């Protein structure tokens, strides 16, 4: 363990990661146009409310905006995302799917959160993580890959589950990233894991292939708190871990954490 720090917005990250946010919105039932009951104000990030419109007007989300020189990983846990981009691509994904996009020389894309259910709420839970590109690949052509939930590896043990969005965990290897990604080189040992623990259960994070050179972050997103080794970490905090040593994560109440390393 290196340090435990308070979470901000966006989450603090370590190289090669540039940015991380966790969206948790309790959207109500939508109307016949998949809209929310209220209109957005153009920049709705009010965390005191049950849900946010972000930059959307009637459908919440993040309309068209430019990216260049890095990658975005949109890891969905619950809810739907509508993707459109300047390459002419578009589609809907969610409920455990991962979109991994290489912005490269530049792309404009939008991610909206349609309220697809008219007869029940539309909860949304997802992470968006930005991963730097190697210098030699900064200006490659933009591209993306879709990893569908049913194909994403999951490790199950008694009272614990790990979704392997990237990297390797206990013999399970994540699906292939885009070819120009920092994560495409196994020597970089990039990993993104989503971990769910029942109350009182634990799991041990392995040593990185990079040893002390790797930088590993652990974000607590749900639950009152966890023990990281011998130290307690409450909700609203994250840990910078030593990657050259194993780390036992134990939940007091049921908890969910995300780990990013590289």
Q: Which residues does each PLM region occupy?
A:
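Jelly-roll (double-stranded beta-helix
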Residues: 1-262
């Amino acid at each position: 363990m290196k340090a435990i720090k308070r979470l901000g917005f966006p989450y603090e990250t370590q190289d090669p990661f540039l940015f991380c946010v966790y969206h948790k919105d309790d959207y109500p039932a939508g109307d016949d146009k998949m809209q929310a009951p209220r209109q957005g104000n153009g920049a709705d990030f009010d965390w005191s409310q049950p849900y946010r419109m972000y930059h959307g007007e009637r459908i919440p989300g993040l309309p068209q905006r430019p990216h260049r020189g890095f990658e975005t990983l949109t890891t969905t846990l619950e809810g739907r995302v509508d993707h459109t981009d300047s390459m002419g691509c578009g589609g809907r994904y969610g409920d455990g799917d991962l979109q991994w996009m290489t912005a490269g020389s530049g792309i404009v894309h939008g991610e909206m959160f349609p309220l697809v259910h008219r007869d029940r709420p539309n909860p949304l839970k997802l992470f968006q993580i930005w991963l730097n590109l190697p210098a030699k690949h900064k200006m490659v052509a933009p591209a993306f890959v879709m990893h569908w939930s049913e194909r994403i590896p999951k490790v199950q043990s008694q009272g614990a589950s790990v979704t392997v969005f990237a990297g390797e965990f206990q013999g399970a290897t994540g699906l292939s990233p885009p070819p120009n990604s920092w994560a495409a080189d196994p020597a970089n040992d990039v990993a993104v894991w989503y971990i769910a623990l029942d109350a009182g259960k634990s799991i041990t994070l392995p040593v990185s292939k990079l040893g002390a050179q790797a930088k590993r972050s652990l974000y607590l997103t749900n639950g009152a708190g966890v023990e990281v080794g011998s130290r307690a970490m409450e909700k609203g905090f994250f840990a910078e871990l030593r990657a050259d040593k194993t780390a036992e994560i134990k939940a007091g109440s049921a908890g969910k954490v995300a780990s990013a390393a590289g």
